């Protein structure tokens, strides 16, 4: 990953420090909408991989495992796998009233819960808007879902 800079178009580029990385995420949610139009979700499944080193050759057949239920206590759990609430990566959707609303990811679902939403996210930069590494590149081709 490249060094993180901030560039919003209104000021000079500023070096922030740290490294920016590509990320691939598969998130399964169980969503519902309340009477006020707020959209809520439980995290059913999580498969997130940060690509923290250069991969010079094309990789065929790469797999990202999806883990079900509450994974926060697992030894391999990383902070970037957390629920998306109050983070720069919060998700939004159009509710039944036609408004763009933030999705409130309230907790972890039981591992046997049936999801009703699949999110697949490919990011060349895993930081918030206007922060990133100049030169980060992520090539994606032929995505396949295996059930």
Could you say what each language-model-derived stretch is?
Residues 17-20, 110-115:
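Short helix-terminating capping/connector loops at secondary-structure junctions
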Residues 33-112, 133:
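Extracellular carbohydrate recognition and processing domains
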Residues 23-27, 61-65, 119-123:
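One-face residue pattern on beta-strands with alternating periodicity enriched for small/polar residues
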Residues 20-24, 60, 134-141:
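Residues that flank catalytic or metal-binding motifs in active/ligand-binding sites
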Residues 1-34:
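Extracellular-facing segments of soluble proteins and assemblies that are Gly/Ser/Thr-biased and enriched
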Residues 3, 29, 67-69, 146:
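Solvent-exposed residues in well-ordered beta-strands and their adjoining turns
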Residues 111-114, 126-147:
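Extracellular carbohydrate recognition
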């Amino acid at each position: 990953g490249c060094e993180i800079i901030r560039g919003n178009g209104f000021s000079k580029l500023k070096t922030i420090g740290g490294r920016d990385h590509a990320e691939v995420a598969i998130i399964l949610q169980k969503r519902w909408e309340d009477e006020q139009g707020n959209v809520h979700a439980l995290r059913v499944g999580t498969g997130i991989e940060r690509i923290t080193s250069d991969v010079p050759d094309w990789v065929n057949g790469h797999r990202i495992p999806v883990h079900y239920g509450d994974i926060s206590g697992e030894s391999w759990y990383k902070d970037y796998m957390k629920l998306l609430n109050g983070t720069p990566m919060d998700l939004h959707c159009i509710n039944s009233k036609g408004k763009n609303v933030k999705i409130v990811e309230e907790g972890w679902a039981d591992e046997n819960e049936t999801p009703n939403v699949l999110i697949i996210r490919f990011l060349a930069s895993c930081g918030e808007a206007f922060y990133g590494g100049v030169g980060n590149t992520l090539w994606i081709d032929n995505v396949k879902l295996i059930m």
